[in-house]
A protein has these predicted regions:
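Short, low-complexity disordered leader/linker segments with a strong preference
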Residues: 1-57, 386
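Early extracytoplasmic/lumenal segment of secretory-pathway proteins
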Residues: 34, 43-123, 251
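A structural signal for short loop-to-beta-strand junctions that line the ligand-binding cleft
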Residues: 49-51, 104-116, 131-136, 140-170, ...
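Periplasmic solute-binding protein
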Residues: 118-131, 146-149, 155-182, 205-213, ...
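Ligand-binding pocket segment of bilobal, Venus flytrap-like solute-binding proteins
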Residues: 121, 197-201, 205, 209, ...
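Extracytoplasmic/periplasmic substrate-recognition and gating elements
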Residues: 263, 272-325, 386
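Mature extracytoplasmic/periplasmic domains
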Residues: 297-360
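Conserved C-terminal helix/tail region of periplasmic/extracytoplasmic solute-binding proteins
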Residues: 356-386
Length: 386
């Protein structure tokens, strides 16, 4: 979910990593050698994979506060790889704009893993900026990836990406001060004027407003996008919308400045735990579904270690620790069974393990490309900056 970590914080997980290192190390030994080439646009980068087991240094770029404390040191202990874990992604667009000049030259700024939203991964695949995964190096991904995430339209064989976490965008309310907010349309009710926050994410906020208008985001035309933006603009200009936020809406809910917000499922889990008055509500129109994916950029200096990392975090025991900390939807099968024993409350939470019936009216992030994308982003940015 793009931009989801800006300005916010996460509760620290309470369970330390418990991993059977022998199993992990055996799987890591499958990392492959050889070479592959990646072409796209005007870029052609030759990638040479390290031979044998992973070693050396691995540089990872991820969003802030998106991993528990134990996973990185456990990976280092299991593999001997030295990890430089950078929490330097605060916006998909900002990070891409920073990296694009390097990627166009077949360089990655020393990084071997990025974690980016589906739409950005799709863009980078088309540009030829990503390496294809060697499936023999990531057997746990093949074995344990949730069925619902195995064949996204932008990467149907998961040749270039492995989900890091998934989640939902919907409504978080103060159930005492906004008891009757159940839909996106309810956020436009004048009784809540000046008490509503909207996300500053065009690919989540605008499609949700489309759903309020009865439009299927997956079939939306440019006119549908513009009509929804116009509705948001009117609400912003009238003062109905208090402000547009990243996940700093958490502070607004906590201090009472907002009574209802468009927000993310993982934040809702954490907010509810700290304040029982706050509650996630699945919009009657349905939510937006998203994932953020691990990818290996062209020019990655250590793709073997990158694949070893992907394989490691797809061990259910490892992923269970991550899930306990971040509280988003885990992409790994087998995690629920582990948490049923050590954290039953999380295991039964629909926001972490949503059923098909729970998300039946939800929609994936719709595509935006080319001239249409430029027009939509320009129009939405004008509202944000208005």
């Amino acid at each position: 979910m793009s931009g989801m970590h800006e300005g916010g914080s996460r509760r620290r997980g309470v369970t330390l990593l418990a991993v059977v290192l022998a199993l992990v190390t055996a799987a890591l030994g499958l990392a492959a050698c050889g070479s592959s080439s990646v072409e796209g646009g005007s870029t052609e980068a030759e990638q040479v994979k390290l031979e044998g087991k992973p070693s050396g240094k691995l540089v990872i770029s991820n969003w802030p506060l998106y991993i528990d404390k134990g996973t990185v040191p456990a990976f280092e202990k299991a593999t001997g790889v030295s990890v430089s874990y950078k929490e330097d992604i605060n916006s998909n667009e900002e990070f891409f704009n920073k990296m694009q000049p390097l990627l166009a030259k077949g360089e990655s700024g020393e990084r071997s893993i990025f974690v980016l939203a589906d739409y950005m991964v799709a863009k980078m695949i088309k540009l030829g900026y990503l390496m294809e995964l060697d499936k023999s190096g990531v057997p746990n991904v093949t074995k344990n990836l949730s069925k619902s995430l195995q064949s996204p339209p932008f990467d149907p064989e998961r040749s270039f990406s492995a989900p890091w976490q998934s989640g939902m965008t919907g409504i978080i309310v103060n159930k005492e001060t906004a008891p009757d907010v159940h839909s996106i349309c309810d956020l436009f009710n004048p009784k809540y004027k000046g008490k509503v926050d909207f996300l500053n994410e065009v690919r989540e906020t605008v499609p949700l407003v489309m759903k309020c208008e009865g439009v299927n985001p997956e079939e939306a035309t440019e006119e549908d996008w513009m009509n929804a933006i116009e509705k948001i603009k009117g609400a912003a200009e009238s003062g109905q919308i208090r402000r547009f936020t990243g996940n700093d809406y958490a502070a607004d809910l906590t201090n009472g400045n907002a009574v209802a917000v468009i927000g993310w499922s993982g934040d809702a889990v954490q907010l509810q735990a700290d304040n029982p008055q706050l509650e996630w509500r699945m919009p009657t129109e349905g939510c937006m579904l998203w994932s953020e994916d691990m990818v290996i950029p062209v020019g990655a200096p250590n793709p073997t270690a990158a694949e070893a990392w992907m394989n490691f975090v797809y061990e259910p025991e490892v992923q269970a620790n991550i899930a306990e900390y971040v509280n988003y939807v885990t992409p790994v099968e087998g995690v629920k069974e582990i948490l049923e024993k050590r954290n039953p409350e999380l295991a039964e939470n629909d926001l972490i393990f949503p059923s098909a019936s729970f998300t039946k009216n939800c929609s994936p992030t719709p595509p935006l490309e080319g001239e249409e994308e430029q027009k939509v982003i320009k129009a939405f940015d004008a509202v944000l900056n208005g």
